Amino acid sequence: TEACRRADNGAAFIDRVRAEANIDLEVIAADEEAELALIGCSSLYDAPQGDKAYALLFDIGGGSTQITWLKLHHVAGAPDRADTEIIDCSSVPCCVVTLSERFGCGEDEEGRASPELYGQICAHVRDLLAAFDARHNISRLVAEGAVQMVGTSGTVTTLTGVFLKLPRYNRDRVDGRQLKFTELGSARDHLLGLDRRD
C-alpha cells in the first residue's frame, strides 16, 4: 500500500491492473490502513490492567511499517476484553524491502549479517521512530510495562515461526501467540547466526 502511495507511477500501476486484470484497486490512506489492521487484531488485546492501558500495533509490510498507538478501555460486561481508541498512527518508510535496498546484505566472511550492519539498521529504525516515540513517551511506557505490543502480517508471523522452530507456517500455532522480548531476542539471534546457505 505504501509503495503505491509513494510511487511516482502509482496511478499508472492502478490503471494497468484495471486494464490487464479487470481489478479496481483502491490505494487507501495510511490512517485507514491502520484502522483496518486494528479491526483485524481486535480480539488480541487484553483488557487494561492497572497502568497497562496502552497498545502499540505494528504492521511490517513490504513497503512500509504502520504503527498505531492505542488507548485501551474496559468493555462493560466483558472483563477480559479491551476496546481500543486510536491516539495516533504513522506510516514509516521502513520494511524488509526498503532496508535491503538501503543497507544491502552486509555479510561477513561466513555469509552472515555483520554486527555492524545490524547496528546500523537498528540506529536507522530508531531514528525513523524517534519523533513518534517522543510524542507519546512510548519507550518510557514500554519500560514501565504499560504497553501491549501487537504485531501483524508476514514479518511478525515469520519471526514467531522461527522462534517456535516450525518447519513451515502453522497458523494454529502462530496466530495470537504471545512472545516475550527475550523470546524475540532468541529468534533474532538465531537469524543473525544463519549464513546465506541456511
Where are the model-predicted features located?
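Helical "lid/coupling" subdomains associated with nucleotide-phosphate turnover
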Residues: 2-55, 69-71, 76-80, 85-198
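Active-site-adjacent helix-turn-beta-strand microarchitecture at beta-sheet edges
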Residues: 63-64
